[in-house]
Amino acid sequence: MAQPTLPPGVLSMHVLPADHHDKDWDAIIVPKQVKERLLSQALVTLKHGRKLSQLAGLPHGLVVLAGPPGTGKTTLARGLAQVAALALAKEGATTLLEINPHMFPSDMLGESQRNIMRLLQDTIPEIAARRPHTVVLIDEVESFAVRRSSASFETNPVDVHRATDAVMLGIDEIAKKLPSVLFVTTTNFITAIDEAFLSRADLVMHFALPDPATIASILQHSLEELAVQWPAVLPLAKARKDIEALAALCSGWNGRQVRKLILAGLAQRLEVAKDPAQLKFEDLREAARKKGGVEWAGDAAPSSKELFGEVPAELKHDHDHGHGEDHDHHHKTRRMR
């Protein structure tokens, strides 16, 4: 069965709560009060937005998550939609709408403005009417609500102004007409976002790089996940002192880099790559000393025969299929030289 075509600018659409969205919230290690504050803010909009819209200080249902890359903002935003949907499940389903802001800029004068107006005035209201609750996730929102005061050096500052004006107008209209719609946005560059957009936010939450204790918790969580597939790894996840020592080697890393350290550890030795159950802390420490996956090539590597010996003929494949004409031409050219 063919998947339905999504409207322009819509990256994905999900109906929540759904089991396959459960992991995102727990995957990001942040203080408990951070998650509680985010969930509380989401419920205020999704559950009480219509009543609160009668107040003089109109809520905009807008949350901005700001911080360096790899700090878990987007994953946490998706997880927030799921846990909010779980909290509101008795009152009806929730739609999670992910927007691709990079689809809106256009070289044609005024086209960016029209695209944004179409999204905010037509697409989102139409989708929001389907279910009681709607969460709209906009990643890298700085490309959607460009800071107008810095647009004088842009190729087309007039269009930037018009597009950002359209964002403000659309956000205001949705806040008035659909006050139970929650916008969760993320940015790596908060100074690139228009001041008027930020002033409309009900919550701006800044994320920093993880401290040593948080890094240790991320490492432990990652090892526990690995142990689900290879139970022999579980003792590593329980060795708190070793984990804390490893965390000290990861100072200044973001959460994504810390999680990828486990993958880098698996790739330090061929024995471990073949059988991850043989993973040792020394593999992880070696990977950490090399800054995860960032390494310089050293001496000449051994040949494949030195590594694996002769491969039996019955395991080898013919070399006479699976290539296009260019491949044949390349080999003919080499033979002629």
Regions found by a protein language model. Give the residues of each.
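C-terminal alpha-helical "lid" subdomain
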Residues: 1-25, 212-337
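Pre-Walker A (pre-P-loop) alpha-helix and adjacent loop at the N terminus of AAA/AAA+ ATPase modules
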Residues: 20-61
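Walker A/P-loop
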Residues: 59-97, 122
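Short glycine-rich substrate-engagement loop in P-loop NTPases that contacts/grips substrate
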Residues: 93-128
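Substrate-gripping "pore-loop 1 plus following alpha2 helix"
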Residues: 114-119, 149-177
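Conserved P-loop NTPase "ATPase switch" module shared by AAA+ and STAND
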Residues: 128-152
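Structural recognition of the conserved hydrophobic beta-strand(s) that form the central parallel beta-sheet
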Residues: 137, 165-169, 180-187
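A short helix-turn-beta junction within AAA+ P-loop NTPase domains corresponding to the substrate/partner-engaging
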Residues: 195-209
